[in-house]
Amino acid sequence: MITFSQMLLKLQEFWAKQGCNIVQPYDIPAGAGTFHPATLLRSLDSTPWSTAYVAPSRRPTDGRYGENPNRLGAYYQFQVLIKPSPDNIQDLYLQSLEFLGLDVSKHDIRFVEDNWESPTLGAWGLGWEVWLDGMEVTQFTYFQQVGGLPCSPVAVEITYGTERLAMYLQGVDSVFDIVWNENEFGKTTYADVHKEGEYEFSKYNFEIANTEMLFRHFDDAFNECKSCLGAGLPLPAYDQCMIASHAFNTLDARKAISVTERQNYILKVRELAQGCAVLYKEQESDRLKRVGR
């Protein structure tokens, strides 16, 4: 049986062999792997770029106090971005499943059309969900636009739902029963690592989080992002955009934002993301000179 840790390592090994740069998780909370600058900003580059990484993801509204076997407020995605998109990307994906020990000839694997959109990032793309014997385990997206800008050449993003995939590979019905690691020293489960965190962060996100503080955090990050953009610094600006986005997500979980206000906050985050994307793209030639390209 493949453990959760082994699965993540093998995905990195497989995609490294396909030419992807293995980067590390980003150090700011985000709701999805797409938020990582290695995907969001680098997808706008005119030059080729390939990367893969584990993406710890936080979605405060999805927490269920550790009581739901299939729903988490924090989880792991495995993210792949390749630009330009290779013609054999579906075959490569199927090969990655085989590399994990899955005999794809013995399973029903379907690519179901499911176009993707992120209103807060001003991004959208054409793509599919990948269903493995009726369960969605991956999202494929051909980025058409990011931060309101066209992606040229088009990049392909693959996002593995790692917990779902591990549940399937291990034959367990609860995410908390996933074997995280097993060796001569003993066995560690997903529950050992994360169940208490699911309970405590659900309580925090739904009941305890100081909304006045979070509103201040949002405003501070919004203003700091604008200052960084004015200073010509898209990377620090984008950090502040991510901080604002996470503050908004926590406020949303606390039900501190009305339906009308919610749309306004989404538009504010989108304004920041678009500002970062536009400045990042405008500086491309200067940036390439600075890094010696």
From Swiss-Prot:
It catalyses: tRNA(Gly) + glycine + ATP = glycyl-tRNA(Gly) + AMP + diphosphate. GO terms for cellular component: cytosol. It is found in: Cytoplasm. It comes from the Bacteria. InterPro entries: aa-tRNA-synth_II/BPL/LPL, Gly-tRNA-synth_heterodimer, Gly-tRNA_ligase_asu. Gene3D superfamilies: Bira Bifunctional Protein, Domain 2, Class II aaRS and biotin synthetases, domain 2. Tetramer of two alpha and two beta subunits. Belongs to the class-II aminoacyl-tRNA synthetase family. This is Glycine--tRNA ligase alpha subunit.
